[in-house]
Structure formats: C-alpha cells, structure tokens
Amino acid sequence: CDEGKLRLDSKVFGEDGILKHITEIKDSRAKDITVRHLLNHTAGFSRRMGDPMFRIADVIKWEELDTTPTADQLIAYQLRQRLRDRPGGSAQYSNIGYLVLSRVIEVASGKSYEQYLQENVLWPAGCYDMHIARNYYEERYPMEVKYYGNDPNDRIESYDGSGNMRPREYGGNDIRGLQGAGAWVSSAVEMMRLVASIDGKPGVPDILSKESVAEMRRITRKGDYALGWARYHESTQTLVRTGTMSGTCAYIEHKASGISYAFLTNTSNYRGASFTNSLGTMIRNAMSRVQEWPTDRDLFVEVPNTEEATGSES
C-alpha cells in the first residue's frame, strides 16, 4: 500500500476487482471482499469442506483436474462455495485468504509473490536467505533443516493426486503451494530482522511507513485479528504471530518495550496450536527472570568475512 499500487479497501473480486479474471462467483457477496478483509480474516470464506490448502488431493478429484491446481484454480474452487458470513463480519482464520493475498501481490506488481517479497520487503530488511519452501526432503535449501512429523510412520495420500502415500511434511501436503499462507523458509534470526523492520521502533529503520505500522495494529472489534499478525493486545501493546503444521511450529512476539523473540522448531506434536501458546508462556516466564540483557550483540552490524580480513587461504 505504501507504493500506491493497492489500498486496504481495494476490492479483490468482480469487474472492478484486482483478480477480476476469476469470474465464477457463487455468492455475490464475495465481490465485496477487500484486501483488508483478507488480512484480518473477515472475508467470510467457508471451511465446510475443510481447508482446501490442506486437501489438494481431494480438490483434484472434486474438480476432475489432471494436475495439481494452480493458485487461481484453488481460489476459483473456493468462490464456487457460498460464504459463511458477509465480508467484514465475524473473523475466522483463513489460509485460502492468504493465498488470495499472494495472488493480489502478483497481479498488482507484475512479479511472482516470492520475487516481489524478496526484493521489496525481505532484502531491504536484511533477510537474504528466506525462500518459498519446496515439497520434498531432497529439494531442501542448503541451510534448511530436516522436518519431523508427529509420527514417523504417519502417511497420507500425496497432495499431487498420484495415490502415493507420503509423510505429511514431505509430499503429503503441498507446502510450496501455500505461498503467503505459510510456505516461507526462514531462520529465527531472519524473522527477528523482519520484525525489527516493521515494529515502528527507533534503532532499525522500518521498511513501512508509520501509517502502515499503525494500521497493522488497529483493531476495532474484540476478537478481530491484527493485519498480518495473529493478535494485538492493546493493553500491553504486544503483537503475536503463531503457526503450526506437521514438521514445524513457530511463535513470534513483539513487546512494547522493544524486545521481540522468535521460536521456531523443526518438529511438531498433536497439540497443534495450543503447543505454540505453551511456547509463548514458557519464553515469557524465562524472560521475566532476566535481570540484564547483553548489549554487545547487534545482528544488524555487518560482520566482515574473516578469511578475507586476515588474508587466509582455503
């Protein structure tokens, strides 16, 4: 929005919408969905048939497709269902909503979602090793960990409709296809670089305007989501973002004091979202016992290449 290519209240679907090329819409109320509704999960999308982002093999069967559905095909599938509520009504977390946002970014920018985020958000924030995930262990990035699901013997039908049985974290789910709904590969350090670049605090230059930083936190109704964040506790001015799926969990918190932290795992358990909340409680309890924080560690300082500085050879 800071670039003027979008507005939070821009319509997404319909003749005047950003994604006007997706024309088959069952519920006319969907034409009222805005970028803001997608960001705070009030678009009204139904999950009566489950979360399509994690039912790709079923969507292939239901839609009689020959290949894995594209983002537009998944969005079109969702729009052939009635909304569960009017846009701007009650909030319900929606992965498909964040896939729609990914396509909004692509159409508005003329670039792939990954390329645009890297060039205009991540690299300016100093995050040079964040990428959209790949689906199989042998395709992992050079510094990427191995993921461990809840049960090493757990297998589900491959997302690609082949009928093969795969681990959920490696081919069972289409992780790459999640795009903005949860496909990013990152380290905790890079996550903190990003948070420090959008927190509105002095010290690290923000990549967003003051107005956009404030807008992210603006909540007008109890129970609503902050824009891009899971929760904003106005009384303590604390921002929280969580995430969990087979093979990984994440918890990020930013406090009014300027202290932020990220906790990422390469495993998961059956507790799902409640596990990430337990992580937050554990870290807050540990932090309350810290009397003094080190001041000699700045992750934003350029560290010289030791070998070049000393002239050593490999």
Regions found by a protein language model. Name each.
Residues 6-25, 124-125:
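Short, glycine/proline-biased beta-turn/loop segments that scaffold the active-site neighborhood
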Residues 24-238, 242-244:
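Short, surface-exposed loop or secondary-structure junction motifs
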Residues 249-271:
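Short, well-ordered beta-strand elements
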Residues 235, 270-314:
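Short, gly/Ser/Thr-rich active-site loops of penicillin-recognizing serine hydrolases
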Residues 1-4:
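Juxtamembrane transmembrane-helix termini
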Residues 21, 139, 269-270:
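Flexible, glycine-rich phosphate/dinucleotide-binding loops
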Residues 8-10, 229, 260-262:
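A short, well-structured edge-of-sheet supersecondary motif
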